Amino acid sequence: EPVMDDAADRAYRTTWLSDIHDFPLQVATLALSPREHVDSPLLVFQKNAFEVEPGTMVDFIDPSTGEEVGKAVPRFDTIASNLPYVDFNTKEIGRYSQIKDELKQEARAAGIKLHDRNDLYCYFCLYLERLLNDGGVACLLTSNTWLFSQAGVSFFEMLALKYQIEGIFVNGQARWFHKTKVMNALLVLRKKKP
């Protein structure tokens, strides 16, 4: 039992959850809250993912003191995300245009032309690489639309530049989420070591 307690405590102290919207954060907080010994803050925060980089300071409430505690976002061994299905025309996501331009410039330097019609999640998949440790794994739920488009070809080339692609899983039989109009793809990506 002590080993389980140590593993559970380690998971609790090293699991960070973030979203741009408050409802998913409320659900995450409720899911993490029922613990016997709550002696460290829940690492749940609201922020646009394009504004999160290693070293970004985030404030949490320490449950044992009630005081605000700042913690720096680390690099992660694992990132899991159900990415937003927002099209390429979005303007409401802060820093999106800047990050998109940076990634397009990086692609050009590698001889890859990222298509202007790539959706937000494509850039998010590429952006997450900077939050992973070398050899870290990203497990990302996306739309499958990029698999069948010209824009998807250059996106795949950029993924292959940054990551070892461990797998792309698609269910061609049914939608994973009943209210969505698109089929899903699950990407499992391992950040390449320099």
Predicted regions and their residues:
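Short, conserved SAM-binding/catalytic segment
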Residues: 29-40
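Alpha-helical hydrophobic/aromatic positions enriched in membrane-embedded helices and signal peptides
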Residues: 11-13, 40, 69, 74
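Short, solvent-exposed loop/turn segments at the edges of secondary structure
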Residues: 10, 39, 180-184
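Conserved SAM-binding motif I beta-strand of class I
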Residues: 14-19
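Conserved SAM-binding strand-loop segment of SAM-dependent methyltransferases
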Residues: 38-49
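Signature of N6-adenine DNA methyltransferases within the class I
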Residues: 20-26, 33, 49-55, 65-194
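Conserved SAM-binding loop of SAM-dependent methyltransferases across substrates and taxa
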Residues: 1-10
